[in-house]
């Protein structure tokens, strides 16, 4: 392509290639040909790796749509014109950008000038207000300090002063009610009074003393108001069943810090409840319960035991109820001696009923309803004394003393009644009945003793007290009975006396065997029975030996001495006499029951009778054994002793067993 004409010369590729091939060994003129170099460069170009060339060709294809000679010749001009148009468009666009930038630059310059002006004005204002800023800073610091001091003051007042509402609660009217808020305010006063002690250990001693004095005065005023209110509340507790309000319980808890006011309030409560209990006791005696149920206690005055029992039961229930009321009243009190306070107040409350109770029980006892009833009443009084003292301790001295006095009085009259009965036994001693059984006086006395002991066994008096009473009762009754029986039997024969005494002692023993605490007396009675049994055993053995013909022979054998010579030579001890005696003894062996003393049939105990028969039979066998040994002894010179005593002692024992 010639640079001046703008034409593009297209050389056929084949010809160019042939020219190159033919000139492989060509000259340097061919090598320096610019056209050849350009063609070679173009032909050697690798379009795949030349992205710029590819982009240029793509752009060329957008407007080079017709491949003709004319378009090829005008291509350079078209490209330049297109480039010029693009550059003009670019210049036009950048001109707009330049104008915008110039506008922005003007704005920025204006803003910069404004900022510079403002900075200058601020600097001038700062220089002018420097003193004001310093003063403001100082005032802010002072404000912070004052705010902190205000907070400290508020905290101080909150901790060491009461609010107006709390002051109103504590300084309320004299007759105004007490609520739970009152106790919260009172607790706050106590807390402040304790906390203010911290100030006394600092530089604020004056303030601490003033606050402490103020709180102490306020406390006294509050406690005085609380005491008056509690007194008024206690005076209203006059119903038989009183309900202790929670506020009154809190009041007693608070008053424990003032022992004198606490004691006065308890006294007021005790006085109110005392009149209520006395009125309730009189109503129970004369009017009965609501609607007549239960019936008045006085209606049972004809039944001494029930009459006394109902009165004591009512008092027991009332005492327990009053203790429960006091426990409810003082349940939050933690001071020492609460239990003693309860016992003391209950003692004061129940003291009012002692006089009417004592008068009525004395009337019952002095009327002497009988030994058994007196003993039951005595045990009843002892039981309630023990029961009530278990509920309230021994501090209720007046009531317990009254019950104890009535117990001792009934016990005294009871033993006087027994002693009188015993003295009557000795004043007129009966003779034993023909059957040698217990006398009517003995039977009556044993019936009385059985009833007394039965009531004693059924009582719920403590074991040690019951045992002591038992010993005294037995001594008061049994000793005169034994003496009466001995005097009554003193005019009888030996066997009759022993039989009568065994029957009487046996009745006493069977009566005592049913009850506790009688072991010692039973042993004593058994010893006396055995002594009289020995008498009956000997009498029965003697009775058998006499009627069986061996009594004289046995006595002679026992009394025989060697210097008297052989037994066979003594009078009535020869072989003939012995054989005659053995005939009678054989009759006894064939029917031993026919030789029983009549007195044995009067014995009340079959066991005792069998014992007497058994042991008396052993004595008979022993006597026969001694006689048999003496007869068989050659020294006594009996001829053919086997024909005289043809039974050995073993055979006799076998027959009698």
UniProtKB/Swiss-Prot annotation:
Parts forming coiled coils: none
- Going by the entry's taxonomy, the superkingdom of the source organism is recorded as Eukaryota
Task: Cite the entry's keywords alphabetically.
Answer: Golgi apparatus, Membrane, Protein transport, Transport
| A GO BP entry | protein transport
Membrane topology summary: Peripheral membrane protein
A cellular component term, taken from the record's GO annotations: Golgi transport complex
List localization entries.
Golgi apparatus membrane
Record bears the keyword Transport: yes
Record keyword Transmembrane present: no
How does this polypeptide assemble, per the annotation?
Component of the conserved oligomeric Golgi complex which is composed of eight different subunits and is required for normal Golgi morphology and localization.
Q: What does this protein do?
A: Required for normal Golgi function.
What the record says about family reads: Belongs to the COG6 family.
Stated name of the protein: Conserved oligomeric Golgi complex subunit 6
Per the UniProt record, the source organism is Bos taurus (Bovine)
What gene name does this entry carry? COG6
């Amino acid at each position: 392509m010639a640079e001046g004409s703008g034409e593009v010369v297209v050389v056929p590729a084949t010809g160019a290639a042939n020219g190159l091939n033919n000139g492989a060994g060509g000259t340097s003129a061919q090598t320096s040909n610019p056209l050849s170099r350009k063609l070679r460069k173009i032909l050697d170009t690798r379009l795949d790796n030349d992205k710029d060339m590819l982009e240029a060709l793509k752009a060329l294809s957008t407007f080079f749509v017709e491949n003709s000679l004319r378009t090829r010749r005008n291509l350079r001009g078209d490209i330049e014109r297109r480039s010029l148009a693009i550059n003009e468009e670019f210049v036009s666009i950048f001109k707009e950008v330049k104008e915008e930038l110039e506008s922005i630059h003007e704005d920025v310059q204006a803003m910069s000038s404004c900022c510079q002006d403002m900075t200058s004005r601020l600097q001038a204002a700062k220089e002018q207000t420097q003193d004001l800023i310093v003063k403001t800073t100082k005032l802010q610091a002072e404000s912070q300090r004052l705010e902190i001091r205000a907070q400290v003051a508020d905290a101080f007042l909150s901790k060491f002063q009461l609010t107006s509402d709390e002051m109103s609660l504590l300084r309320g009217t004299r007759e105004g009610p007490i609520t739970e808020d009152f106790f919260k305010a009172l607790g706050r006063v106590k807390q402040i009074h304790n906390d203010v002690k911290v100030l006394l250990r600092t530089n604020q001693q004056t303030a601490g003393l003033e606050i402490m004095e103020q709180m102490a005065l306020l406390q006294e005023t509050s406690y005085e108001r609380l005491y008056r209110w509690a007194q008024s509340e206690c005076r209203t507790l006059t119903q038989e069943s009183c309900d202790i309000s929670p506020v009154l319980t809190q009041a007693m808890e608070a008053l424990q810090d003032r022992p004198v006011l606490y004691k006065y309030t308890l006294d007021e409560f005790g006085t109110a409840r005392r009149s209520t209990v006395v009125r309730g006791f009189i109503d129970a005696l004369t009017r009965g319960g609501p609607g007549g149920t239960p019936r008045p206690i006085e209606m049972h005055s004809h039944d001494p035991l029930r009459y006394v029992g109902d009165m004591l039961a009512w008092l027991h229930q009332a005492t327990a109820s009053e203790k429960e009321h006091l426990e409810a009243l003082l349940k939050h009190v933690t001071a020492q001696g609460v239990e003693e306070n309860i016992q003391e107040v209950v003692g004061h409350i129940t003291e009012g009923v002692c006089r009417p109770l004592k008068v009525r029980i004395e009337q019952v006892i002095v009327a002497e309803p009988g030994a058994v009833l007196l003993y039951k009443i005595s045990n009843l009084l002892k039981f309630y004394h023990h029961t009530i003292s278990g509920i309230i301790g021994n501090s209720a001295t007046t009531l317990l003393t009254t019950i104890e006095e009535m117990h001792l009085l009934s016990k005294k009259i009871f033993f006087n009644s027994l002693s009188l009965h015993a003295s009557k036994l000795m004043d007129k001693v009966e003779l034993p009945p023909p059957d040698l059984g217990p006398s009517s006086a003995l039977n009556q006395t044993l019936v009385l003793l059985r009833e007394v002991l039965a009531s004693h066994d059924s009582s719920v008096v403590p074991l040690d007290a019951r045992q002591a009473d038992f010993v005294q009762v037995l001594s008061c009754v049994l000793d005169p009975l034994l003496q009466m029986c001995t005097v009554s039997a003193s005019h009888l024969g030996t066997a009759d006396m022993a039989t009568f005494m065994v029957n009487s002692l046996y009745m006493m023993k069977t009566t005592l065997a049913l009850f506790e605490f009688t072991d010692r007396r039973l042993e004593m009675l058994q010893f006396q029975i055995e002594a009289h049994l020995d008498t009956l055993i000997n009498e029965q053995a003697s009775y058998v030996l006499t009627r069986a013909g061996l009594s004289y022979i046995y006595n002679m054998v026992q009394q025989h001495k060697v210097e008297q010579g052989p037994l066979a030579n003594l009078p009535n001890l020869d072989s003939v006499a012995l054989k005659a005696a053995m005939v009678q003894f054989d009759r006894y062996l064939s029917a031993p029951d026919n030789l029983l003393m009549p007195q044995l049939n009067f014995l009340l105990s079959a066991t005792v009778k069998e014992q007497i028969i058994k042991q008396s039979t052993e004595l008979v066998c022993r006597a026969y054994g001694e006689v048999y040994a003496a007869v068989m002894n050659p020294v006594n010179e009996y001829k053919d002793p086997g024909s005289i005593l043809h039974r050995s002692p073993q055979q006799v024992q076998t027959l009698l067993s």
